[in-house]
Every structure is written in structure tokens, then in C-alpha cells.
Amino acid sequence: SCADAYKSCDSLKCCNNRTCMCSMIGTNCTCRKK
């Protein structure tokens, strides 16, 4: 399974070969294009 947004990048697989990035450590994480 994959996701488009999450609260943490730990063990998060992003859809469409995107990279998980957080605005702050452990919060507001989103999957963005590389």
C-alpha cells in the first residue's frame, strides 16, 4: 500500500515514486515528486 500524506515518514511508502518530506520533524508529512 502507499499513501499521499502521513504524520511520519517512518516506513511510509509514497505513491507514484514520490518522496516523503516533513515540514517539521514527525509532523505534516507529504509525498512529493522528486
From Swiss-Prot:
Protein name according to UniProt: U10-ctenitoxin-Pr1a
Subcellular location: Secreted
A Pfam family it matches: Toxin_9
Gene3D superfamilies documented for this protein: 4.10.40.10
GO MF assignments: ion channel inhibitor activity
Record keyword Flavoprotein present: no
InterPro entries, per database record: Spidertoxin
Organism: Phoneutria reidyi
UniProt KW keywords: Disulfide bond, Knottin, Secreted
Phylogenetic lineage: Eukaryota, Metazoa, Ecdysozoa, Arthropoda, Chelicerata
Keyword Disulfide bond: yes
GO cellular-component term (any): extracellular region
Function as written in the Swiss-Prot or TrEMBL entry: Non-toxic to mice and insects.
Domain remark text: The presence of a 'disulfide through disulfide knot' structurally defines this protein as a knottin.
Family of the protein in this entry: Belongs to the neurotoxin 02 (plectoxin) family.
Tissue note: Expressed by the venom gland.
Disulfide pattern: C2-C15, C9-C20, C14-C31, C22-C29
